[in-house]
Curated annotation (Swiss-Prot):
<dbReference type="GO" id="GO:0035610">
    <property type="term" value="P:protein side chain deglutamylation"/>
</dbReference>
<feature type="compositionally biased region" description="Acidic residues">
    <location>
        <begin position="366"/>
        <end position="392"/>
    </location>
</feature>
<dbReference type="InterPro" id="IPR050821">
    <property type="entry name" value="Cytosolic_carboxypeptidase"/>
</dbReference>
<dbReference type="GO" id="GO:0007005">
    <property type="term" value="P:mitochondrion organization"/>
</dbReference>
<dbReference type="Pfam" id="PF00246">
    <property type="entry name" value="Peptidase_M14"/>
</dbReference>
<dbReference type="InterPro" id="IPR011989">
    <property type="entry name" value="ARM-like"/>
</dbReference>
<dbReference type="InterPro" id="IPR000834">
    <property type="entry name" value="Peptidase_M14"/>
</dbReference>
<keyword id="KW-0121">Carboxypeptidase</keyword>
<keyword id="KW-0963">Cytoplasm</keyword>
<feature type="binding site">
    <location>
        <position position="915"/>
    </location>
    <ligand>
        <name>Zn(2+)</name>
    </ligand>
</feature>
<dbReference type="GO" id="GO:0005739">
    <property type="term" value="C:mitochondrion"/>
</dbReference>
<dbReference type="GO" id="GO:0050905">
    <property type="term" value="P:neuromuscular process"/>
</dbReference>
<keyword id="KW-0645">Protease</keyword>
<comment type="function">
    <text>Metallocarboxypeptidase that mediates protein deglutamylation of tubulin and non-tubulin target proteins. Catalyzes the removal of polyglutamate side chains present on the gamma-carboxyl group of glutamate residues within the C-terminal tail of alpha- and beta-tubulin. Specifically cleaves tubulin long-side-chains, while it is not able to remove the branching point glutamate. Also catalyzes the removal of polyglutamate residues from the carboxy-terminus of alpha-tubulin as well as non-tubulin proteins.</text>
</comment>
<feature type="binding site">
    <location>
        <position position="1012"/>
    </location>
    <ligand>
        <name>Zn(2+)</name>
    </ligand>
</feature>
<comment type="similarity">
    <text>Belongs to the peptidase M14 family.</text>
</comment>
<keyword id="KW-0862">Zinc</keyword>
Amino acid sequence: MSKAKATADKCLSNNSRIQSLLSQLEKVNAEPLLFDSDNTRYVTAKILHLAQTQEKTRKEIAAKGSTGMEVILCTLENTRDLQTILNILNILNELASTAGGRRINALISKGGSRILLQLLLSASKESSSNEELMMVLHSLLAKVGPKDKKFGIKARVSGALNISLNLVKQNLQNPRLILPCLQVLRVCCMNSVNSVYLGKNGAVEILFKLIGPFTRRNTGLIKVSLDTFAALLKSKTNARKAVDRGYVQALLSIYTDWHRHDTRHRHMLIRKGILQCLKSITNIKIGRKAFIDANGMKTLYNTSQECQAVRTLDPLVNTSSLIMRKCFPKNRLPLPTIKSAFQFQLPIMPTSGPVALLYSMPPEVDDVVDESDDNDDTEAETEAEAENEESDQLCKNDDIETDITKLIPGQELGRTLEDLKMYERFFPELTEDFQEFDLVSNEPKPGAKLGPIIVPTAGEEQPEVPNNFMKDLEKRSCNISLEDECNKRPTFLDMPKNVTNKGNDGLGQQVHGDIDRSCYYFSSDIVKDLEKLSLRKPSGNHPCRNGCVSAKDKPIFLPHPCNKSTSNSGSCSNNLFEKHSMHLSPLCCSGITPDDDESSPLDELAMREITDFDNLLPLHDPDLYIEIVKNTKSVPEYSEVAYPDYFGHVPPFFKERLLERPYGVQRSKIFQDIERMIHPNDIIDRVVYDLDNSSCSAQDESEVLKFNSKFESGNLRKVIQIRKNEYDLILNSDINSNHYHQWFYFEVSGMRTGVAYRFNIINCEKSNSQFNYGMQPLMYSVQEALASRPWWYRVGMDICYYKNHFSRSSIATGGQKGKSYYTITFTVTFPHRDDVCYFAYHYPYTYSTLKMHLKKLESLHNPQQVYFRQEVLCETLGGNGCPVITITAMPESNYYEHVYQFRNRPYIFLSSRVHPGETNASWVMKGTLEFLMGSSTSAQSLRESYIFKIVPMLNPDGVINGNHRCSLSGEDLNRQWQNPNVDLHPTIYHTKGLLQYLAAIRRTPLVYCDYHGHSRKKNVFMYGCSIKETVWHTNANAASCDMVEDSGYRTLPKVLNQLAPAFSMSSCSFVVEKSKESTARVVVWREIGVQRSYTMESTLCGCDQGKYKDLQIGTKELEEMGAKFCVGLLRLKRLTSPMELTLPPSLIDIENELIESSCKVASPTTYVLEDDEPRFLEEVDYSAESNDDADPDLPDTIGDFENTALEEEGFSDSEITRTHTSGQST
């Protein structure tokens, strides 16, 4: 007890003692005439002793409300006694050294910076300045300066810059004194005006004298000198001066010397300081030239290679990489023009916009490169990483609409009712009386094709498949290590297109003798197990197609002319894909050489096995697909069919995880690119594929890969062989455009096994990609398909996305200069020799595939239950029809009451695929269509609840011709909804007309949803429209929370968040942006008056939450999302009409709470995406200069704010999630 009391007394004594000492100083400051130097010296010495020994003393002096800091600074300002000044400076140093941030800020707020600079000025005027005073004073200024934002200006105005610089000049041999002086100069150089001022006064030359070759002496001084020198060189004037004096060569020599002698890596910071100086100099053009002339590329490349083995030297490797990439000469794309290789003449010419500008350019203009390409003097201040720049913009989003008048929705049809009557014929359901229909009987009509098809949900396994088979299949498929015994397949023959059906028999006999038999070997276990994969019980008497070859007979492949001029299309495809044989038509571009020429008795078994996929692909008919392709009109007039589109895709039976990116992979790829300049003799640089040069044919050499993209939705413009197994690929621009390079779909053949092939797509435009965050490209192998694995699967290792050295001309960037393209690079080792493989950005879904699926759905549906109508809404610019679908339930009878109920069902309007490269939108739509046409109770209930009007492909021309974003008009159709042109944007004009017609007859849809894909976010989510949430984000109106708005727009997303595993409510946004005012979502909400108007975005990558966390998205999951959307609409009806169905009271209460949820929830905007793309441990910037802004020409690719929404209230779903439909999921 006495010990505690003694401690308390001691603390009290210490506190009272420091207060007493400060009171004495305060009295002296109040009465300057009574100033006693000895007493002041004694008091400050005592305070210094206490500050050095006791933390409580330091806290007391700087405590909030304490006058200790003011008293000490006031004493410093008034005294002229040297020892007193030194005592006070040391006191302040002690305060700044511990818990420095807060205490230094307190010192600055009391005017400490001004007092210290004045003291420096007065001390310099002394005839003989005290070295200790200057050292202590500069040491304190070096700590205060970084915390004072105006320190640089204060130092320059007070004249302190010259004082510090002169001290360095006069004391070059006194490291103890000049070290703190250099620290102060380093802080002052953060101000660009100060840097220029110091440079004019000889600072560049002085600092360079302090830098030298390897030494073990004064390393601290050398480190600070280098940091100060690097800061000084950020001024372009100083950098030019350094170049003129030959400092670039000298710095490279110094760096090499330190690298050679610092074998234990103890002086890594000095070596990095030298690199920082080079980095500052190479911000200017002459600096980059001097670096290259001094052989800097090779010097840094060699030293970096030696450093890569030591992880602690990564900062040196990264900085060296950044310098080399910056100095890598800017190259033009090896193209004659950046405009599309395909030309399409528009019916009318736009008067303004990018297309008009494109056509107004004289033919002689070189649009690939311009004089800006190597004139980008990059200021160091702008070299923040792109993620940080995006993060800074989180504070404010100027794109959010602030005009309340524009936010208030209202029906503005813009067309008269008479004009809109042209759309009456697309709504036969409103006038149909069903008098000619027999609706009394529930029995199906004779001859109708019935038999439900099960749509598999992504999370369900088929019970018919044995566990041992699934484990074995998953083990083999996940490793992509497929047995050699399944590699072999028949020869595919390329037949001349001018052969007619006449005389096929004779020609077939002639060819038959020349066909090499290919051997197959299938494990009997695989055969037995695959027979069980059918989702329907196989019919015992399944009829064979016309021309089908018996399973007992050896299949004979006959050539057939399948060009579009063939008169008898039916016979053309008889033998193309038969029940027990499979053969690509002559439309398929490439032949395949079998692995060996030996024949096998198991050929028959292999061919029979392929028939199982008829059951897995009920909506796929290769013969029908060929017929549809012949009538599909493309600008290049394609005459070939890609094998995956012909044969079909079955979702693999294994999950594909997001790829974990190995450390250092991006850096390794960058160094391989740098080697192109350092070792130019190793570069082959041979064009192996070129759409612009029809004479460029595939090489006959067996070591060279062969490429092709001349088929529907294909996109690959040019391929250049760089090294033996490395190829640069260039994508084609959208037609009538000079950019939008993202979608790719091409064929590769002639590969060898065990060889790692590197593919670089070098003209990408977006500043980042999900390829950096786990996404892989897709591959389809013909040999795998013939071995009963006909699916697209994720492939590729060492995948990364980074800025390259190919420059974008200002013509392609809307006037912005100095921008570069980006590279997607991936490495693939093919499992089969001489295979034919296809690569795609995402799962392809062509226009012909859509038409085939619609025809199959129509033929499979039950006409007594399902009201299905397919009509052509309009003809596109390219001459292709745009289908519009009507789906609902047939009335119970043709009695008036039932017909009246049929006609008065609310409308749901859906659309999809306005952007051709977003193929996932079509797969989601496929899931929706199959569910709606299904025979399950839920599907029937949904059809009885709504009339569905669906435009499944808004941009057929763009899809057909391999565009990524535009139609043939060269414009983004999703930016034309405000004022679509009937000649240039017919599909948008007439789709909007359908909606306007519904609004005009007072049948405004309950829900409108446009299906899209998102390339830079994970999960599935929705964008909606809300006045209140938009105003809330602008902070323009503090009373925005008092606004009254129906929160029903949130109901459907909340329901989907409960139903769909891939859906994420936290990624949804209901903010209206200015840049999105002409999109379908906003126009339908504002002009048509649909409150529940949405864009549903599906990831191209995968999920980071829920059931599919860390998995890449597949077609099974996408189709499941489409089906879950339908279930969500059924739940929406129950939520908005809870008394319509008999539900448990508890469920009704919870569902009502969902509707009444508060609108105070903050919703993210669609601006910046940070958490979805976290930084890597590997601190390598994917861009060369790290100064990328969001792409102005791609405003809709910008990410979202971090979600601040409250956690949504959930409820259990008792719905049956397994849906049985009359269309089978593929």
